[in-house]
Amino acid sequence: MENNNKNINTTNNSTTINTNNNNNPINKNNNNNNINNNNNNNINNINNINNVNNNNNNNNNNNNNNNNNNNNNNNNNNNNNNNNNNINNNNNNINNNNINKKNINNINKNKINNNNNNEIGEEKAVEGGFLAGLSRNVTRIIGSFSSGMAEESAGYPLDLIKTRIQLSQSGVSGGGGTNTSIIKIFKDVIKTEGVIGLFKGLSSPLILSALVTAIQFGLFEDTLKYFRKHQYFKNHDTLSLLFSGSIAGFAQSFITCPVDLVKIQMQIQGIPSSQPNSNNNNNNNKAKGNSYFTKLIYREKGLLGFYQGLSPTLFRDVPGLAIFFTTYETLKKQFGQPELSTQSPTEFIKSFIPIVLSGGSAGVFYHGLTHPFDIAKTLIQSDRSATKYKGTFDCLKQVYQNQGPKSLFKGFSAVAIKSFQSNAVGFLVYEMVINL
């Protein structure tokens, strides 16, 4: 019994449970409820989780909102700061505008003052430039005048001898004969007229030669400066020198012609009346002066009479001065530009050598190449009747036919010596004065 009961219980228990589980409606409902509850619980759990997540999200949102609020606050603060900065900037702009207005006023005042100062400065600059230019021109004029007087004085005795030789029938250039003629005429002048006779007629050409030299040098330098401004002549400087010298020669011919005419009339006073071309009153031993011959020429021929011999003068001076200045400038460059230093007597003398050699050589080239025209000028100007020669080339033709080709260089020995020494002295004086 006990065993059976046990078995039955066991079985019953199991069975009961199973039966209860399967067949009892309440249990089924309970189970369903439990299931539902579990589901609900699960749902609740899920909802709780969702709520937690929502809460977290809300917290995050709140944090974000707080951050945004903080950012907004920061932005507001920045905006406030910017507004303050803008206000400050506006104030600064206002201050700057005021300062700018003041600066503009000051600038305008300064401009007015500067304009006034510039006008004063320009006036002073013009005045300074004018004075500087005037000083240079005055120095150049003084140098030219001094050069002309020194040149004329140094070469005048030989110029007188040259004129006498050119007018004589016996003096022929070359060899000992010419040297004898120079010495002979030199002795004759001193014997018959004294030492002062070597300077007969000097007073008029002395002053006028200074004027001629001033015009000659001034015109040459100004013309040369003009030519050298042009690129073509910068690349062909020799042409600049030739053209400038030619222009200076053309201008000076209109001054030297009347001067030489009066000078030659005075120089031939000592020639014996038996010689042709003497045209003087030797019966009166008292020499006539410049004023006498100036009045005589004007009375007989008028103003145009002073330009007797202008044609050969132009033939001599236009190409002559072109050669003269070109030779001088070229040789001076070859010898080296001298510095007129006074450091010692030896250096002072050495600095003169390039000038002396350049100036003297230029004079010899000038008169050597134009000497036939100088002879024609002398013969035409010594013919007071102005009927013997029809012109320059007619004069040269007659000289050539009557006396041979050598006569075209009659008196050149005296001319060469005179040209070298007078032009050497002339350039030396000029360079010394303008470099002082």
UniProtKB/Swiss-Prot annotation:
GO molecular function terms listed in the Swiss-Prot or TrEMBL record: L-ornithine transmembrane transporter activity
Keywords: Membrane, Mitochondrion, Mitochondrion inner membrane, Repeat, Transmembrane, Transmembrane helix, Transport
Membrane topology annotation: Multi-pass membrane protein
GO annotation terms (biological process): mitochondrial L-ornithine transmembrane transport
Gene Ontology cellular component annotations, sorted alphabetically: mitochondrial inner membrane; mitochondrion
InterPro entries: Mitochondrial_Carrier, Mitochondrial_sb/sol_carrier, Mt_carrier_dom_sf
Stretches in topological domain Mitochondrial intermembrane: 1-137, 216-238, 335-347, 435-436
Family: Belongs to the mitochondrial carrier (TC 2.A.29) family.
Subcellular location: Mitochondrion inner membrane
Recorded superkingdom: Eukaryota
Protein name (database record): Mitochondrial substrate carrier family protein Y
Native species: Dictyostelium discoideum (Social amoeba)
Function: Mitochondrial solute carriers shuttle metabolites, nucleotides, and cofactors through the mitochondrial inner membrane.
Gene behind the chain: mcfY
SUPFAM superfamilies per UniProt: Mitochondrial carrier
Segments on the Mitochondrial matrix side according to the record's topology features: 159-194, 260-313, 369-413
Disordered: annotated segments: 1-102
rRNA processing in keyword set: no
